[in-house]
């Protein structure tokens, strides 16, 4: 137990343990076919658990490679073939479920290497370092505020402390009821912080997830502030694979599913889904698959398109169809720029700094 954990306990910080509800039977009584639509983190995680329990699972992924936004694919360059990716992705240490899945690829998680820092880079102000903080609250937050060059004591005195209290009082129901109709931009404006502190200490929570604070729910920002800073004992510490994602994650997980009797099929888009006697008919451009159970592990635009193309789902799965609009509209395919209301461009580190493959290629 670290000193920050001890201090937290002394002032009343306690862990809140959630009962996962048992997790179901360790094995199905007899093999039953299931189809998982989507081969990203959600789909492959579902396939791993189902295959281990004896389900005859088939993963159907529309792209030629697994992983979605965490995917990797080969690119032919003048100097040879290089694995390409969507950018730098690291795994925070409170990602317990995901790390449990990754242990199927490597029981020791030896392929994950710690990233030593978490620098916030700005075109206008000096670097702000979010790394190397005590892991446990409230010591991590206090240390960040005390050492930050972006926030002075006079700034804290002029801040609207009542407006800031919701950042410290996250609740999975009450926070969304109160703040989901307020933007993160409005919440940050109410704090009365100087531009530098706002951009370097708070807007980073929206920019790190490719959101602009003017279009992001204030409840989501409060949830992120809680989950990454105040709501876990691991702190802002994370690791990244020492190989590209395809080599380190997706190929081993696909082999794990296949070892347990499952199949992983890429380059196969699902076009429609129909209820049939005894299960479902999952149609693809090249044919189809019959399954007793179906897991839809798609992003919101793909899910909405599949539901629209499958009109019989309204009667077969009315709850699913009713929930689809709540997932939001598909975002425009535009180039993201981390530009806040202050006109300050910020970003978190460099891809080549954390990815060994990219670092080697840049040399």
Model-derived features: positions:
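Conserved Rossmann-like nucleotide-cofactor binding loop
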Residues: 42, 65, 301
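Short, flexible hinge/linker loops that cap or flank conserved catalytic cores
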Residues: 26-29, 143-145, 288
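Glycine-rich FAD pyrophosphate-binding loop
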Residues: 51-76
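Helical element adjacent to the flavin cofactor pocket in flavoenzyme catalytic cores
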Residues: 224-285, 289-293
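Mid-domain catalytic core of redox enzymes
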Residues: 2-14, 30, 268-363
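Mobile amphipathic helical/loop "lid" adjacent to a hydrophobic cofactor/ligand pocket
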Residues: 98-99, 103-104, 109-218
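Conserved FAD-binding subdomain of flavin-dependent enzymes
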Residues: 77-112
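N-terminal Rossmann-like FAD-binding beta1-loop-alpha1 element of flavoenzymes
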Residues: 30-59
């Amino acid at each position: 137990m670290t000193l920050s954990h001890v201090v937290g306990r002394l002032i009343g910080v306690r862990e809140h343990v959630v009962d996962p509800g048992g997790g179901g039977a360790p094995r199905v009584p007899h093999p039953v076919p299931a189809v998982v639509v989507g081969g990203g983190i959600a789909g492959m995680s579902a396939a791993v658990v189902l295959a281990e329990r004896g389900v005859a699972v088939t993963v159907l992924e529309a792209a030629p490679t697994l992983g979605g936004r965490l995917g990797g694919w080969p690119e032919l360059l003048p100097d040879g073939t290089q694995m390409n990716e969507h950018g730098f992705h690291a795994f925070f240490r409170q990602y317990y479920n995901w790390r449990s899945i990754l242990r199927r690829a490597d029981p020791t998680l030896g392929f994950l290497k710690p990233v030593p820092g978490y620098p916030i880079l700005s075109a206008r102000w000096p670097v702000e370092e979010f790394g190397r903080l005590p892991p446990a609250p409230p010591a991590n937050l206090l240390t960040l505020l005390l050492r930050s060059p972006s926030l002075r004591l006079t700034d804290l005195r002029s801040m609207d402390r009542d407006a800031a209290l919701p950042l410290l009082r996250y609740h999975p129901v009450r926070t969304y009821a109160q703040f989901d109709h307020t933007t993160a931009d409005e919440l940050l404006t109410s704090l009365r912080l100087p531009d530098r502190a706002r951009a370097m200490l708070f807007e980073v929570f929206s920019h790190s997830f490719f959101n602009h604070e003017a279009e992001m729910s204030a409840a989501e920002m409060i949830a992120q502030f809680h989950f990454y800073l105040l709501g876990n004992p691991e702190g802002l510490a994370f690791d990244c694979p020492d190989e590209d994602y395809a080599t380190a994650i997706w190929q081993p997980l696909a082999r794990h599913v296949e070892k347990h009797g499952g199949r992983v099929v890429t380059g196969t888009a699902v076009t429609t889904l129909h209820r049939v006697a005894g299960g479902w008919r999952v149609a693809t451009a090249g044919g189809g698959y019959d399954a007793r159970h179906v897991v839809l592990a798609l992003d919101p635009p793909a899910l909405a398109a599949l539901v629209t193309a499958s009109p019989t789902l309204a009667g077969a799965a009315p709850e699913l169809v009713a929930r689809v609009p709540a997932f939001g509209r598909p975002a425009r395919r535009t180039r993201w720029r981390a530009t806040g209301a202050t006109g300050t461009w910020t970003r978190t580190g460099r891809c080549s700094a954390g990815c060994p493959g990219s670092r080697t290629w840049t040399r």
